[in-house]
């Protein structure tokens, strides 16, 4: 590890292979916590490259729990977090809208790291059992159309690093790679990131991971979601080509809304917001979900245009299908799925 730390101190980039090997060291028991903290801080200070991100993703996916079945057409809409905006759980709420529209959603997530309420905290509050095994997740994806992958359970080698991330209390490369380490073999992806200068590198990593189609967004105000506040910077991966775009919510019929107006709270408060949105209540929370779910449906290829994606997201909510997916996941995740274990 000393060689890698020395390179980072000197401001040098690591190659993909060096980062892969450094990643395996970070996940091992043969490294001091102080070395892990130093590595993460130095890497953040230098700035992460696409090669470094992909190298670490390779190491993490290699050490993740194995999945025997590969569900066709699975998607994730997990974002990086780390924007400090304290918004409600936009991507988790949107996940049920996607599922209601017929997308198989393998939602990767965690407890709160830099926010008040993480996706795992919200789902537990709603009554979802987040402790599903890989076989149970395969079952849920096949029969319910949505499953939650609790990151610490999927990546047991990350336990020490999670503790150090919490103590550092600043975004690190692990915020960036969270959405990229989903152990399910995804076909498409919608990723919100908190760093605008990482849009292209993250899209390049998704390309290396073999995604058929993907969309990476940095929202107005540097939100790790699409925002109603103003223009959103977007990178689209389609047909193995990467295209940069700007998305203005006003062009899709939405009014401008400041990010402060979509702040969330604790898990109880955020659960109330999520149920309200999925129940069809009109609000700025609903509009934010419609924009994000619409973009995700477009990224998935479910619709040909963003406008069609927003219409399909609206139908998913107003038909009751999105709320039904939540209720089905609550019921199915709490059943004894012995037949699949």
Curated annotation (Swiss-Prot):
Cofactor: binding comment: Binds 2 magnesium ions per monomer.
Residues involved in anthranilate 1 binding: 79, 110
Sites where the protein binds 5-phospho-alpha-D-ribose 1-diphosphate: 79, 82-83, 87, 89-92, 107-115, 119
Subunit composition and interactions: Homodimer.
Name the UniProt record assigns to this protein: Anthranilate phosphoribosyltransferase
One GO location term (cellular component): cytosol
Binding-site residues for Mg(2+) 1, renumbered to this chain: 91, 225
Top-level taxon in the UniProt lineage: Bacteria
Tagged with keyword Transcription: no
GO function terms (MF aspect): anthranilate phosphoribosyltransferase activity; magnesium ion binding
EC number: 2.4.2.18
Transmembrane segments: none
Gene that this sequence comes from: trpD
Purpose: Catalyzes the transfer of the phosphoribosyl group of 5-phosphorylribose-1-pyrophosphate (PRPP) to anthranilate to yield N-(5'-phosphoribosyl)-anthranilate (PRA).
